Design a protein with these regions (language model features):
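SAM cofactor-binding core of SAM-dependent methyltransferases
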Residues: 2-72, 151-153
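Conserved phosphate-coordination/catalytic loops
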Residues: 14-17, 100-107, 128
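A short acidic-Thr-Gly-centered motif at the start of a beta-strand
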Residues: 1-5, 111-114
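Conserved acidic-Pro-Pro-aromatic motif
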Residues: 10, 22, 29-32, 111-283
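A short helix-to-beta-strand connector/capping loop
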Residues: 53-60, 99-100, 118, 143
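Glycine-rich adenosyl-binding loop in Rossmann-like folds that engage adenosine-containing cofactors
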Residues: 67-111, 116, 184-185, 189-200
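Residue-level signal for well-ordered alpha-helical positions
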Residues: 49, 89-92, 136-137
Length: 287
């Protein structure tokens, strides 16, 4: 895929932009930022907050539900009544009464990137849907230099390491972003500066993230030890030329290698046992 509208400009996609707290940082890192957010109320807030950047054509706000479906015009979206960060595209299974169902315009991954151009960095943070969008993105041969996704599902890491062909990784812990990355040195399009990331923002990406890049095996062992949760997995390809090439047919072997190791790990076995005991106790209580 090549950009049809923005040439070789550096484009960042903020997929799951929420209230736009990541946008100021991304504007410092790119020529254009595409903020994708389904919640229309949050989009209105961003339009007011970043009116100047929108007018300068540095920021585009896409009010749509990003989906992996090929043909879609309108899709249901579930807005949490009190915590907007919990709003989601898949129908909620936990306390659905806390959500308001609305129908919003849908857009596919292909449509989004075809309209705005090839990405330099993609942040994916869509509640319970990161791995679906990531798979669609990689299946369409979209492999930006830098990419990140939230690790509530191990499939995010596995897809990056197999189908994505990425071989260098870092982790950003969401709970510590505001403290760890306060007055943090970052590189921008105009040089180096110090920046403080707000609470509940995604934090830095790429070379701005603390620590050395590690290989897939090292990161996998960290996830086995520390578990998943509120943390973003960041990835890049050490050899950018190889990133442009499609992964070999052996990527499926790599996928199942990590998938099965995760499923049979002691932590996952313990989790399944706890789940079984919890369900059993609920049945006993109900009589």
């Amino acid at each position: 895929m090549t950009s049809i509208t923005n040439g070789n400009k550096k484009i960042i996609y903020d997929i799951g932009a929420n209230n736009g707290d990541d946008v100021p940082y991304y504007l410092k890192k790119a020529d254009i930022v595409i903020a994708v957010e389904a919640n229309p109320i949050l989009c209105e807030q961003m339009q007011k907050r970043f009116a100047l950047e929108i007018e300068q054509q540095k920021l585009v706000i896409e009010n749509c539900v990003l989906t992996a479906a090929n043909e879609v015009t309108s899709v249901p979206f579930y807005i949490h009544k009190t915590k907007h960060v919990l709003s989601q595209f898949p129908a909620p299974t936990h306390k659905p009464e806390n959500y308001e169902k609305v129908f919003l315009p849908g857009k596919t991954v292909n449509q989004l990137f075809y309209e705005h151009g090839y990405p330099y960095y993609v942040k994916i943070d869509i509640e319970h849907y990161d791995h679906v969008i990531l798979r669609s993105l990689l299946n369409n041969d979209i492999r930006p230099k830098y990419i990140s996704g939230e690790s509530h599902s191990i499939e995010v890491f596995i897809l990056l390491a197999s189908l994505g062909n990425y071989d260098a990784f870092k982790i950003v812990n969401g709970s510590s972003v505001a403290t760890k990355y306060h007055n943090w040195p970052i590189s921008t399009t105009t040089g180096e500066e110090v920046y403080s990331f707000p609470y509940h923002s995604a934090g830095p990406f790429g070379e701005d993230v603390a620590g050395e890049w590690v290989n897939s095996e090292s990161l996998f062992r960290t996830l086995l030890s520390d578990g998943l949760g509120w943390k973003d997995i960041h990835a890049k390809k050490q050899d950018e030329y190889m990133l442009a090439r499609r992964p070999s047919v052996l990527w499926r072997i790599r996928y199942w290698y990590y998938f099965l190791r995760w499923k049979i790990s002691p932590s996952q076995r313990l989790k399944r046992i706890r789940g079984f005991l919890y369900k059993a106790s609920k049945k006993v209580i109900k009589g």
